[in-house]
Swiss-Prot record:
CC cofactor: FAD
Catalytic reaction equation(s): UDP-N-acetyl-alpha-D-muramate + NADP(+) = UDP-N-acetyl-3-O-(1-carboxyvinyl)-alpha-D-glucosamine + NADPH + H(+)
Source organism per UniProt: Clostridium tetani (strain Massachusetts / E88)
Annotated catalytic residues: 177, 227, 297
Top-level division of the source organism's lineage: Bacteria
Residue ranges that the Swiss-Prot or TrEMBL entry lists as coiled coil: none
Entries under SUPFAM superfamilies matching the protein: FAD-binding/transporter-associated domain-like (SSF56176), Uridine diphospho-N-Acetylenolpyruvylglucosamine reductase, MurB, C-terminal domain (SSF56194)
InterPro entries: FAD-bd_PCMH (IPR016166), FAD-bd_PCMH-like_sf (IPR036318), FAD-bd_PCMH_sub1 (IPR016167), FAD-bd_PCMH_sub2 (IPR016169), MurB (IPR003170), MurB_C (IPR011601), MurB_C_sf (IPR036635), Oxid_FAD_bind_N (IPR006094)
Protein family (similarity comment): Belongs to the MurB family.
Subcellular location: Cytoplasm
Record's protein name: UDP-N-acetylenolpyruvoylglucosamine reductase
Protein keywords: Cell cycle, Cell division, Cell shape, Cell wall biogenesis/degradation, Cytoplasm, FAD, Flavoprotein, NADP, Oxidoreductase, Peptidoglycan synthesis
Gene3D superfamilies: 3.30.465.10, UDP-N-acetylenolpyruvoylglucosamine reductase, C-terminal domain, Uridine Diphospho-n-acetylenolpyruvylglucosamine Reductase, domain 2
Function comment: Cell wall formation.
Length: 307
C-alpha cells in the first residue's frame, strides 16, 4: 500500500477523507455478501470528481473499476487491486414533465417509485430490480417483459478520454444485456428516461402484482446477485438447470436456489470460491446434458485468495 501513498493523499485532498477508504472489504458493498478487500474505494460526489479520479488513476497507471449498487457483481475472495469507484453518492433525481433525469447512482427502484408517485407509467417492471440506474442502463436491465431500452431517452456518459458525451437512444445501442456503453468502456453519469402519463391505480396495481410475483418465485430472503446466467438463445437458463437435476446443489453455503434455479444464493457464509464452484458445476452439467453453454449475467471480478 506504500506505493499508493501519494496517490491516496491526492485523492483525500480532492474528494475529502470521508470519500476515500483503504483495504475496504467488498463483501460490504455487494448483494452477494462476498468479496475480499479492495486497495482503495472512492465515492465521488460530482461529475468533476469522477473525471479527476479517472484521470488521476490513468496518469498513475492504477487500474480502476466502476460500480453502482453491487447487485450484479461477484468479487473474488482475494479482492481487487487498484481502485473501485462507487457511484452511490451520485444520487440526485428530478422530474421534468414526462421525463425523469437520474444520476448514475440512483437506485432503479427509487426511480420506479418516483415515476409511480407522479403518475408516470413504463417503469413498473423495475420496481424490484435492486441495481442502480447506471448499471441498469449499461446492461439494459429488464424483468417481466420490460427493459430499460423501452424508456430511455438519452444519457450523459464519460468516454475513455474523460470527455462527457450526450448519447441518444440510438447511439446507446441497447440489446439483450448489452449496450454501446459496455462495448466502448463508457461510464454512465446520468440517464434521461421518457415515460407516459398513466392512471395511478393501474400503475400501483401493476407494481403490487410484480412484487407478489417476485416474493413468490424468487429467493429474496437470501443474498444473491439475481439471475446468475444470461438467457441462452431458444432456452430458459432456469429450466435447463432444473432439468439437469441441479436444484438445491451446493458447495459450502453457496446453493442453486430451491425456489428458483436461475438464482445462486449465499445461505450464510459462502465464499466467492464456493459460488464460483457452483457456477462451474452448473455450466459443465448443462453443457454435457443439453450441449448448451450458459454464460454468467453476474459480473465476476477480482483475484483469487492465495492459500
Amino acid at each position: 500500500m506504500n506505493h499508493y501513498k501519494d496517490f491516496i493523499s491526492n485523492l483525500i485532498e480532492n474528494l475529502g477523507s470521508e470519500n476515500v477508504k483503504t483495504n475496504e472489504l467488498m463483501k460490504n458493498h455487494t448483494s452477494f455478501k462476498v468479496g475480499g478487500p479492495v486497495d482503495i474505494l472512492v465515492t465521488p460526489e460530482s461529475y468533476e470528481q469522477v473525471q479527476y479520479v479517472i484521470k488521476h488513476s490513468r496518469g498513475n497507471n492504477i487500474p480502476y473499476f466502476i460500480m453502482g449498487n453491487g447487485s450484479n457483481l461477484l468479487v473474488r475472495d482475494g479482492g481487487i487491486r487498484g481502485l473501485v469507484i462507487k457511484f452511490c453518492k451520485l444520487n440526485r433525481i428530478k422530474i421534468e414533465d414526462d421525463k425523469i433525469i437520474a444520476q448514475s447512482g440512483v437506485l432503479l427502484s427509487k426511480v420506479s417509485n418516483m415515476a409511480a408517485k407522479n403518475n408516470l407509467e413504463g417503469l413498473e417492471f423495475a420496481s424490484g430490480i435492486p441495481g442502480s440506474i447506471g448499471g441498469a442502463l449499461t446492461m439494459n436491465a429488464g424483468a417481466y417483459n420490460g427493459e430499460i431500452s423501452q424508456v430511455i431517452d438519452s444519457a450523459l456518459v464519460l468516454d475513455k478520454s474523460g470527455e462527457i458525451l450526450n448519447l441518444s437512444k440510438e447511439e446507446l445501442e441497447l440489446g439483450y444485456r448489452t449496450s454501446s456503453i459496455l462495448k466502448n468502456g463508457y461510464v454512465v453519469l446520468e440517464a434521461i428516461l421518457k415515460l407516459s402519463l398513466g392512471d395511478s391505480k393501474n400503475i400501483y396495481d401493476r407494481i403490487k402484482e410484480l412484487t407478489e410475483k417476485r416474493k413468490t418465485k424468487q429467493p429474496l430472503e437470501y443474498p444473491s446477485a439475481g439471475s446468475t446466467f444470461k438467457r441462452p438463445q431458444g432456452y430458459f437458463a432456469a429450466k435447463l438447470i432444473e432439468e439437469s437435476g441441479l436444484k438445491g446443489i451446493n458447495v459450502g453455503d453457496a446453493e442453486v436456489s430451491q425456489k428458483h434455479s436461475g438464482f445462486i444464493i449465499n445461505k450464510g457464509n459462502a465464499s466467492a470460491k464456493d459460488i464460483l464452484n457452483v457456477i462451474n458445476i452448473v455450466q459443465d452439467t448443462v453443457k454435457s446434458k443439453f450441449d448448451v453453454e450458459l454464460h454468467t449475467e453476474v459480473l465476476i471480478i477480482g483475484e483469487d485468495k492465495l492459500n
